[in-house]
UniProtKB/Swiss-Prot annotation:
Gene Ontology terms describing biological process: defense response to bacterium; killing of cells of another organism
Protein's UniProt name: Bombinin
Positions carrying Asparagine amide: 24
Keywords: Amidation, Amphibian defense peptide, Antibiotic, Antimicrobial, Cytolysis, Hemolysis, Secreted
Location of this chain's protein in the cell: Secreted
Superkingdom of source: Eukaryota
Length: 24
């Protein structure tokens, strides 16, 4: 439920941060 969505959102945010870090 909400816990799964929260974890998924956190992972998505982390992946986005890593992608932006390597893109620079």
């Amino acid at each position: 439920g909400i816990g799964a969505l929260s974890a998924k959102g956190a992972l998505k945010g982390l992946a986005k941060g890593l992608a932006e870090h390597f893109a620079n």
